[in-house]
Every structure is written in structure tokens, then in C-alpha cells.
């Protein structure tokens, strides 16, 4: 049997076993689930560093210290946020309205894992699946296979040790497009959680199954005139260099005003930003993008030094981010697109009105995802809430802010983009997205007096019809009326006469 056939068979086997596990865990109590989650968190924390190192060594993307923090976010921080979340039994009850909401698991989930955040995504999706009493089977990116398999094994073994069913968390070990497609369309898969490239997310939504997918990011960061420039630049630099820019919520372009342009540039230079010449920008763009604005995978998650050397440009020691000035958006301005690495576009506008227009243009290439602004003016924040972005972050780095590390958003590595970006949700995905909710509703009104007891049910024309019926002694519209039947009989009679006449003529 060749590899593709074996991978397809493996996908089928994992789905079958996962469904059995899903049926078992569906009966677990909150206490049992919490015990399992605590065991998974403990194991993930103990292995956070080694998993991070494995991911960097295997993919070449990012920095192991930041991937360690991602693993920490996906386990320790996530657990703190969801431990008291109601996902089992009665999750809401309104005594006055006599309604109840009952949570039920979805069953077997499929999780797609990207190469940029492999171990943290696997841990995260496993955690939210278990919290909602679901089983999950992963489809890993081939370039991150080993570290993903190890992350899945660690949390699976910890879960089983704490009482979870065998095969509750599993992963394809022979990844192929055929296996992924087989899993997506398998009858036992209830929901697909898709985190990855646009093609994979689109395929998930085309599989004929419910899916939670994410769109591409292209986050602009607007430094408004009232901003604390030093703090704004510090947050942006910390965000863009976090794991070398692999988080899709990270800043992609900086927007400044004419009045603060010089101060912002000076602060970026002070904090390790290098402003490239137009010639250097052109060299970097040719390196970063292939076939239009498709990013060169070899440049994803690389340091500024690595990018500069590959582009054959000289940069000062200590450079953390490469910055290229742009004067437009679109194919002629490559840095106006998403760059999951340590490179930023830089724009200058006259005022907030122009910043609004430019932000909307930039967001078209990552619509629905995230944007950030740095300002002390609340009115400016409210104006920017009209932009097509599901996460509008204020005075924080967008990588950490969007994923919930530096904000009060729910910690998540699956960030919905709403219908703007072709997603079924605009939220950070949590266990609450992975449950079916039954609604129990008691009758609170008598069915036979609904109209008569409703003072707003007042239609004069209806009253007139009822009066006419009463006066005439019969309803205006009766089921016993033969008007339609009489018409039909007359029509058939005419047709028959016409046929006879035609025969006579022959």
C-alpha cells in the first residue's frame, strides 16, 4: 500500500476511534473534565520549553523562548480563563422567564495545525476540545509533523492518565492532502477548527461540515497624534518581534501623522528599527514575495539579520525590525500585504481622516482580522470601531493583544474574522464555540388567549372582516366554498367542447 493510501486509511481509523472516545467523554462530569484539564496543563507546562525547541528546529520559524510563552498561553493561561466556564449541563437559567440552556458536546472535532504555531495550536485546541467534552483528531502541517505529534502525545497521555478515554486526542502521522480531505469529509467529524493558510481554511468551509476558520491578517497600527510615542513603539516592536512575527494578528504596517512622523521615526530607530532605502526595500520585497503577494515560506518567522543577509543589504548591529516606507496599497506596494516576519510597511498621513481611509484599504488584504491604534483620545477609538476588523486593539501590541495575552480578550490561537473575512465567527474561538446548546422553555402564556390578551394586537381591518362575517352569517373565506371548484369545472367543460369542435372539423 503506498503512502497516500496508508495515510487515508489512518485518517479513517483515527476518526472511528475518536468517535468512540467522543461518545464516552460526553457522559463525563465537570469534576472529571477539570481533573483531565489540570493533568494536561501540568504536562504541557513541564514540556513547554522542549516542545518550543522542537518546533523551531523542525520548521526554522520563530524563537524558542517566544514559542515557550505560546505553549504557556495555550495551557496555563488558557486554563485560568476557562476553568470556571460553564460547558456542561445547565449553563444558564432564567427563573423569571422560565428558560434553561443545556450544553451538549458536538462529538469528534478535526483540528488543522499550522507550521507557524504548531505545538501551541495543538495544545490549545486539545484543551478547548476537552473542556467542551469533545474528542479531537489533528491534521498537522508536514513541515511541523514531529513537534505536533509530540505535543499531541504529551497532552493525550496526560488526559488518559487522568481518566480520559483512549484516543480522545490523536494526530495523523502520515500527513497528506488526501488524508486531510478524508478527515474533513468523514461522517464522524462534527466540526472542523481550521487554523492555517487561506487555501486550507477555504477547503474546510467547502467540506460540507460546520467549520470555524480564520482569515489572513494584515493589521495596520495607527500612531495617532495624542499617543505616547515611546510606549507605542515599544509595544509595536515587542509585538512584531514576538516569535519573529509569526502570529497573524501582528502589525504589518505603521501609520503615522505628519505632525508626529519625525518623532516616531526617531523612536523606532532608537528601539532597533531600521528604515530601508527605496533600493533596499525593493531587494527585501523581491525576497519576501513570490508570485505577486504570496509570501516566500523561507522568509516566514525569520530575524531581521537573516532577512537582511538573504536580501544582501547591510544593517546596523542590533536591528530588530526592517521598515520600508510605502506610498500606496496594492500590487505595486508589496509591503502593503501580510508579512509574517520582522518587516513592516510605513505610511505617513495628514490626519485621522486619512488614517481611516488608509486603514480600510490595508484591511482589504486581511479583512475582518485585527487592527491597532495608539491614542489617548477616546473619540478616535470610537471612530475606528467602524473599521472592518473583529479586533480593534488600543495601546498594546497587536500580536499579544489579539491573542489575549496583553488584553482581556479570551486567550486563543484561532481568531475569527467574521463574515468580512469569510469566517463563521468574529470572536476568539473558545470552548463555548464547541458546544451545542439546548433550550428548555416553559409556557408562560395561555395559547388560546394569545391574541385576545395582547393589547398591541389591534387591526381595524380584521375587526371589520369579523363584523361582516357575523352579519352575513358565514365567513368571507370558507373551506366549503366551491368557487374555485366551479371555475375548474367550467374550464374543463370549455376545453372538452373545444376538442369536440376540432374533431368535427377534421
Give the residues covered by each predicted segment.
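N-terminal Rossmann-like NAD(P)+-binding subdomain of aldehyde/semialdehyde dehydrogenases
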Residues: 1-100, 128, 270
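ALDH superfamily catalytic-core signature
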Residues: 5-8, 201-330
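Short, flexible turn/loop "capping" segments at secondary-structure junctions
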Residues: 14-16, 213-215, 244-248, 333-340, ...
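Structural signal for hydrophobic packing residues in well-ordered secondary-structure cores
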Residues: 19-22, 26-29, 40-48, 52-55, ...
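Conserved C-terminal structural/oligomerization subdomain of aldehyde/semialdehyde dehydrogenase
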Residues: 26, 313-506
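Flexible, glycine/charged-enriched surface loops at secondary-structure junctions
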Residues: 27-31, 163-169, 244-248, 274-285, ...
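Rossmann-like NAD(P) dinucleotide-binding subdomain of oxidoreductase/dehydrogenase enzymes
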Residues: 90-231
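Residue-level signal for inorganic ion chemistry
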Residues: 133, 192, 257, 307, ...
Amino acid at each position: 500500500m503506498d503512502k497516500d493510501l496508508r495515510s487515508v486509511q489512518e485518517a479513517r481509523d483515527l476518526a472511528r476511534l475518536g468517535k468512540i472516545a467522543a461518545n464516552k467523554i460526553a457522559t463525563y462530569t465537570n469534576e472529571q473534565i477539570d481533573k483531565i484539564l489540570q493533568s494536561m496543563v501540568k504536562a504541557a507546562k513541564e514540556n513547554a520549553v522542549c516542545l518550543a525547541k522542537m518546533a523551531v528546529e523542525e520548521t526554522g520559524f520563530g524563537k524558542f523562548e517566544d514559542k515557550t510563552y505560546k505553549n504557556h498561553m495555550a495551557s496555563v493561561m488558557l486554563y485560568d480563563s476557562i476553568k470556571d466556564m460553564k460547558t456542561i449541563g445547565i449553563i444558564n437559567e432564567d427563573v423569571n422567564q422560565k428558560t434553561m440552556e443545556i450544553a451538549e458536546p458536538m462529538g469528534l472535532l478535526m483540528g488543522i495545525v499550522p507550521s507557524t504555531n504548531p505545538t501551541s495550536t495543538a495544545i490549545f485546541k486539545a484543551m478547548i476540545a476537552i473542556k467542551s467534552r469533545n474528542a479531537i483528531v489533528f491534521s498537522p502541517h508536514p513541515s511541523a509533523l514531529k513537534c505536533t505529534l509530540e505535543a499531541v502525545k504529551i497532552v493525550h497521555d496526560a488526559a488518559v492518565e487522568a481518566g480520559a478515554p483512549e484516543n480522545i486526542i490523536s494526530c495523523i502521522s502520515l500527513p497528506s492532502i488526501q488524508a486531510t480531505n478524508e478527515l474533513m469529509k468523514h461522517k464522524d467529524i462534527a466540526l472542523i477548527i481550521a487554523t492555517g493558510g487561506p487555501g486550507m481554511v477555504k477547503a474546510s468551509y467547502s467540506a460540507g461540515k460546520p467549520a470555524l476558520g480564520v482569515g489572513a491578517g494584515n493589521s495596520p497600527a495607527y500612531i495617532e497624534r495624542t499617543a505616547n510615542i515611546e510606549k507605542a513603539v515599544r509595544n509595536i516592536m515587542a509585538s512584531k518581534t514576538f516569535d519573529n512575527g509569526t502570529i497573524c494578528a501582528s502589525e504589518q504596517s505603521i501609520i503615522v501623522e505628519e505632525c508626529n512622523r519625525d518623532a516616531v521615526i526617531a523612536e523606532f530607530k532608537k528601539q532597533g528599527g531600521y528604515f530601508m532605502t527605496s533600493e533596499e526595500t525593493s531587494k527585501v520585497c523581491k525576497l519576501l514575495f513570490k508570485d505577486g503577494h504570496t509570501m516566500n515560506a523561507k522568509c516566514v518567522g525569520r530575524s531581521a539579520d537573516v532577512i537582511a543577509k538573504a536580501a544582501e543589504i547591510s544593517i546596523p548591529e542590533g536591528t530588530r525590525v526592517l521598515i520600508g516606507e510605502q506610498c500606496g496599497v496594492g500590487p505595486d506596494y508589496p509591503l502593503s500585504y501580510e508579512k509574517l516576519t520582522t518587516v513592516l510597511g510605513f505610511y505617513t498621513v495628514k490626519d485621522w481622516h486619512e488614517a481611516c481611509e488608509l486603514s480600510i484599504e490595508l484591511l482589504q488584504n486581511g479583512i475582518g482580522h485585527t487592527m491597532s491604534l495608539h491614542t489617548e483620545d477616546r473619540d478616535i477609538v470610537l471612530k475606528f470601531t467602524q473599521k472592518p476588523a473583529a479586533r480593534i486593539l488600543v495601546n498594546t501590541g497587536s500580536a499579544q493583544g489579539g491573542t489575549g495575552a496583553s488584553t482581556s480578550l479570551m486567550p486563543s490561537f484561532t481568531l475569527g474574522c467574521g463574515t468580512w473575512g469569510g469566517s463563521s465567527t468574529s470572536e476568539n474561538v473558545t470552548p463555548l464555540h464547541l458546544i451545542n446548546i439546548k433550550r428548555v422553555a416553559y409556557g408562560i402564556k395561555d395559547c388560546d388567549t394569545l391574541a385576545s390578551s395582547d393589547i398591541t394586537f389591534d387591526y381595524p381591518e380584521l375587526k371589520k372582516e369579523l363584523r361582516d362575517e357575523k352579519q352575513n352569517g358565514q365567513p368571507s373565506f370558507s373551506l366549503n366554498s366551491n368557487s374555485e371548484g366551479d371555475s375548474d369545472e367550467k374550464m374543463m367543460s370549455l376545453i372538452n367542447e373545444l376538442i369536440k369542435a376540432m374533431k368535427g372539423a377534421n
